[in-house]
Amino acid sequence: MTTLIVIVLYLCLLLGLGFFSSRLFRGTSKDYFVASHSIGPFLLLMSVFGTTMTAFALVGSTGKSFERGIGTYGLMASISGLVHAGIFFLIGIRLWAFGKKYGYITQIQFFRARFESDRLGYLLFPILVLLVIPYLLIGIIGAGKTIEPVTAGAFSEIFTNPTAPQWLGGIPPWLTGLVVSMVVLTYVFLGGSRGAAYANTFQTIVFMIMGVVAFVYIIQGLGGLEQAGKVPARINEKGVIVQDYRFDKQARELLKNDPPKPIGKVLDSESSNLTDTQPHLSRTPVAVEFKKKNPKTGEISSFERELGIPFITFVSYFFIPLSVGMFPHLFQHWLTAKSAKAFRLTVIAHPLCIMVVWVPCVLVGAWASGVLPPGIPPPAVLSAMLNLLVGDPVLTGLLTAGVLAAIMSSLDSQFLCLGTIFTNDIVLHRAGSKKYSDKQVILIARVFIVVIVALTYALAMWAKNANVFDRIT
């Protein structure tokens, strides 16, 4: 219960920040959509970085590393740091200049003017919406998968149908998703892009600090950095995958399994000698078979998984970071900048911030393979490790709040951008900018944002069992 109280207090603090930022709102549509082009270097860095670090980055990367190993870092993070910075420098600054000069608020306005085509704008609208919707879904899904394990047992008599038996009494994903959606909707509804910028900055600072703290505590729980490297699941001389260690929650220490605990077996591999190797610490593909227990029926079943990253998959992921140049929420953040000089800090520091966030998440996922059951849902790996290795409920609550901060710092900008492009590129473009007053324009955007939030929540509940990483890639 203590953990839940800490999380609730964090959400209340975030709502308070939302109400505060709404008092800075200047009441104009330009301020609602692009903060009157007044965001400085630090706020720009925090809002842009916070927007890119979704549940995909934290919850998804940890879960994918648990499934495939540390090669997950190479799939996205290493190349993303360089590509993102390059796009911010080569494209972001130029688009900001065009927006400042010609009054663009959305990228559809830019493309319509550049190619002198109304039809192109109508074609881009559904494409951009479909580009953003999956990220909204993984935010809501990721939040639900994060909260349920760490609140297990808090309401055993109320929530009796958990995702997994050990999470009985935890806050169900549908309730977490609803609360997160309402909190984000509140401060975006009131403050627009200025409110989102301040909230993003606060939340980005929170999740970066809490991420480092969580990493340190997990390392301590595993007996130090050197010992943590020995924890991932190992392949023995018979081709059986074993866990050499277990974490005793009562003794609060890592204990050695004697004999090692078998959890699966190797089916196929490109390597001929796998004895004593840890597949989660290698990129070499290894086909394995695990067993898992159905949480509802208790039936034991087998499932196959490929550890490691095939070369063709590794190479193909190099192209994914290029998509950042077309994200409408990032375009909108670029236009909030006070000047071109405000981009300097973002271009330089963004790759470093990515490293600070992704390295711990990927390592924790690999380490988790040695202490968690292989059948655990990948999106729940991060919160399960926190719940297992961090004994203090207050600290667990703070660390979980950090994960929620990363999720919500993306949701707000994405909800806002959809309201912005609908209002400006569909409603105002067809009706004319003079038909509606500034207050009416803001109202139209707010109503559409409410509709998008409701639709996203409904879709997230329909797809709640999806893997957060694979939902995007």
Predicted feature descriptions by range:
Residues 75-188, 243-265, 286, 319-320, ...:
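Helix-loop-helix module between adjacent transmembrane segments
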Residues 113-122, 129, 165-176, 423-467:
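Loop-to-transmembrane helix boundary motifs in multi-pass membrane proteins
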Residues 40-48, 86-88, 117-131, 177-180, ...:
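Select transmembrane alpha-helical segments in multipass membrane proteins
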Residues 2-22, 35, 43, 64-105, ...:
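Extracellular loop-to-transmembrane helix junctions
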Residues 36-39, 43, 60-79, 112, ...:
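Loop-to-helix junctions at membrane interfaces in multi-pass transport proteins
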Residues 2, 20-22, 56-64, 70-71, ...:
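Transmembrane helix-loop junctions in multi-pass membrane proteins
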Residues 103-116, 191-204, 326-356, 381, ...:
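Hydrophobic, small-residue-rich membrane helices and short re-entrant helix-turn-helix hairpins
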Residues 22, 64-71, 91-97, 145, ...:
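Membrane-water interface regions at transmembrane-helix termini and the short interhelical loops
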